[in-house]
Structures are given as C-alpha cells and as structure tokens.
Amino acid sequence: IKQNNIIKKEKKLLLVSFTILEDIVKNIVGNEYNVESITKPGMEVHGYQVTPSDLVRGSEAIIFIQNGFGFELWAEKFVTNLDVERITIANNLEPIFINEDIYKGKPNPHAWISPKRGILYVDILLEELSKLDPENKEKFKKNAQNFKNKIKKIDEDFSLFLNTLQKSKRYLVSCEGAFSYLTNDYDLKEAYLWPVNAESQITPKRMARVINLVKEKQIPAVFCESTVSSESQESVAKETGAFFGGNLYVDSLSKKNGPAESYLEMLEYNLGTIKNGFNASLKN
C-alpha cells in the first residue's frame, strides 16, 4: 500500500493563563493553533502555583496570553523564566478599581464577567492575534464576528430581563467582589463578602454589613462562586430570608459535563442563575 507521504504540520502552541481566555482564543483562531490553559477547569487562579511541567509548556509556546490587572499573581515570575512574547488584555481595557481593604485602588481583574466587556476581549485578541499571524487575519475576523454575535445576544436578553426588575431590587450580592464590571454595565448595585478571593476570610464586620444591607434593601437573592465555599453566603440567606440563588462561575470554566464548559455557556449560566434567583425569590 502506498504510504500517504504528506507530512502533517504540527500546530503551534498558544499558552493562556486561565480556561475562560483559552475558550475565547479558541473561538477566534479555530483549528489553526493548539490553545492550552495553564490553570485547569475548576481551579482557583489568583494564587496558582506554577509547576515544572507548566514551564516546559511555556518554553514550547510561541506566545503567552494573560488577563493582567494583577489577576495572575504568578505570571510575572512565570514569564521571567521564559523567552516568550506576551499578550496582556488589561493593557487595552479601562479598569474599574477595587475600593476597599488592602486592594483599594488596584484594578478589579474580572472584566470578562460582563458580556459587554467580553466583546472587548474578542476585539483586543483579534487585533493581537492578527499581528501574530497576518495570513489568517480574515479567517480570525470572521470567527470573531460570529462569536461576538452570540455574546451580543446574551447581552440583549439580560438587558431585557433587567428592565422588568424594580430599580430598588437591582442588587447583586456575591461572595467575591468579582461582578463590578457586570453591575457597572447593567446598572446594578454591587455588594459582597470579600473583595478578592485571595482575601477570602470572612470577618464578622463584613458579614454584618451584608446582612444589614440585604435586610434594609429587601434584596431578593444572594449568590456565591464556584471556586469557593458558599457556606457564609448561605448563612446570609438564612439570616435575612433572602433566596440563596446558587454559585456563579468567575475565574474558571466548569469541569467536563458541568454547566459552564465554554465562555458562552458560562455567561448564559451566570446570567440565567441571577435571573432565576430573582424570579424564584419573587414567587416566594
């Protein structure tokens, strides 16, 4: 039998810092590259410890893509050990700043939580990846447009839902203060038990503050995140009579067969969970 002597071209590696970014990049580049995330689904990203095998993958990659805004506390050290170019999304984004605790004045890194900012992530990555590979620019552009249309649909559906909510009820109460971009973009007010997960010790003072706010404003539902324990927030719900709406995905996509295996699924799941939390509480 005559052997097929076409040598399959090995795909180059684009290494990214976390799973949400991995999925966004894959949606733009399609099958042109291998795209891999250093942190795996369900992992806490802020305080991740780099492993020797991560450094090996880093040395094989043609680029390292990160969020920035201090999200990947380990990235500076990681990149210092490697001779690899870097794309940092935050260099092209307007930050919202954290306004309390030791993180006061530092940028909140979680911009991707808002569909409106997710569209900006796609635009920034499209531009940077087109510079990296001008030959595939048109293909990337087409992929990016398709992806943005899907995000836009999620954005529009959520806006329509919020229009049905009383202004006084538009509070998003979470464990981590990760939703500033979402609350900012959709005219919601934000409250949380701690500003960033790296600082996830709940103090009696913080707890009391959130409980008082939920009672005073009669906030219908409270939420937590998938990578931390929801125990404290469930106590808030019990104490106030608010509905515990469940866990939202913030720093990581879900593991296989979970509800948020892709960025679009994550947006749909989060916004659907928020919607259901408000709706269920209104029925009670």
Model region roles, listed by residue range:
Residues 1-284:
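Extracytoplasmic metal-acquisition and chelation regions
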